[in-house]
Design a protein with these regions (language model features):
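C-terminal segment of N-terminal export signals and the immediately downstream linker at the start
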Residues: 25-53, 60-64
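N-terminal secretory signal peptides and thylakoid transit peptides that target proteins
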Residues: 1-18
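Acidic/histidine-rich catalytic cores of soluble enzymes
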Residues: 69, 163-271
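Acidic-and-aromatic substrate-binding clefts and catalytic sites of carbohydrate-active enzymes
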Residues: 48-54, 72-83, 106-109, 145-149, ...
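Structural motif corresponding to the early beta-alpha repeats
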Residues: 68, 72-174, 224, 286-287, ...
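Conserved, mostly hydrophobic/aromatic
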Residues: 62, 70, 89, 130, ...
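Short, acidic/polar
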Residues: 50-62, 116-128, 228-235
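Hydrophobic faces of well-ordered beta-strands that scaffold small-molecule active sites
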Residues: 41-47, 70-72, 96-101, 138-140, ...
């Protein structure tokens, strides 16, 4: 027996309950996207549910399915050009929600200082492009371990992130730091030395963000919040301005040591308190993007469009259940 729903299962069950329109709302065509009521959180398409779709097809898919925004790709958009990218978003009437910080690993946290300084020069140009198309946020992932003891590594990360934030601030861009709460990310390799623990909870990430600048905040991923032992109180204690973007999925009940990052479920299929999560965000005034990111959940045989629609439908249903969207 299947342990989770296909999109057809989801729609049939909702329809049989006489609640399809109440749960998912009417299907939006490309020209109708961006229809979330003003002042509410809005849904943004993330590439994890539409694998193999490049740019600008990802934006067109988002609009066609009914997302109000898209997690967009800076490199391909720059290749297409500023005017073409602005025209694309104007045509589709969706938002360029967020993009990755355009620094190749091991930057920004590791790597030679000279390489970092050079990357900051390019970042200024990329930030200008990002702002010009109407996007005001970027994101980067924090490793929960570091090459140095925690206090020493925190100073390095703080200094690097602060420098990045200063460049982004000139273009009014916010930077989101995504913490990784799954235990396996903090485990050392078998037979190797134990890693140096770093930051992997919401409160500590918020404190780091505060030390890095007014335009630095958190990418709040419900999966990592749940697996880090996060609480709704943690969210309620976070200033709205420090939450840059939100990722959502769901999780099955299993021992922490067995959890792997690609075992996620669609919102509503698992045990995460999504209603408490969304209601807490609403209470602090969060009104920005929410991207479904159920890594490993979309079957290989499912088309990108069906994957995107399933993510949209299940996420919207969870948000309606929580009372945060109409």
């Amino acid at each position: 027996m299947r342990s989770f729903l296909t999109r057809r299962d989801f729609l049939e069950r909702a329809s049989c309950a006489g609640a399809l329109l109440a749960v998912t709302g009417p299907r939006l065509d490309a020209g109708q996207a961006g229809a979330t009521a003003q002042g509410q959180m809005y849904l943004s398409l993330n590439g994890s549910v539409a694998k193999g779709v490049g740019w600008p097809d990802m934006a067109r898919l988002a609009a066609r399915v009914g997302f109000d925004g898209v997690d967009w790709s800076l490199g391909p958009a720059k290749t297409a050009g500023l005017d073409a990218t602005k025209a694309l978003f104007a045509e589709l009437k969706i938002k360029p929600s967020i993009t990755n910080l355009p620094m190749a690993r091991p930057l920004p946290f590791q790597g030679e200082q000279s390489a970092f300084d050079q990357a900051l020069v390019q970042l200024a140009e990329d930030a200008g492009f990002t702002a010009a198309i109407g996007c005001d946020r970027m994101m980067v992932v924090l490793s929960p371990t570091g090459p140095l003891p925690k206090d020493e590594w925190r100073k390095v990360v703080r200094d690097r992130v602060s420098a990045v934030a200063q460049v982004l601030q000139r273009s009014n861009i916010r930077l989101g730091l995504e913490f990784l709460g799954v235990q396996s990310f903090r485990a050392g390799r078998a037979g190797g030395p134990p890693p140096n623990p770093f930051i992997w909870t919401l409160p500590e990430t918020v404190e780091l963000a505060k030390d890095c600048g007014p335009n630095v905040g958190v990418i709040l991923d419900v999966w990592h919040w749940h697996h880090s032992g996060g609480t709704t109180a943690d969210i309620l204690n976070t200033p709205k301005a420090r939450i840059v973007h939100v990722h959502v999925s769901d999780a099955k009940a299993q021992p922490p040591e067995e959890v792997r990052d690609n075992q996620r479920l669609m919102p509503g299929e698992g045990v995460i308190d999504l209603s408490g999560f969304f209601q807490s965000l609403k209470k602090i005034g969060y009104q920005d993007g929410v991207s479904p990111e159920p890594l490993g959940r979309v079957p290989a045989e499912m088309s990108p469009e069906d994957g995107a629609r399933l993510a949209l439908d299940t996420t919207r249903a969870a948000m309606k259940k929580a009372g945060v969207v109409s």
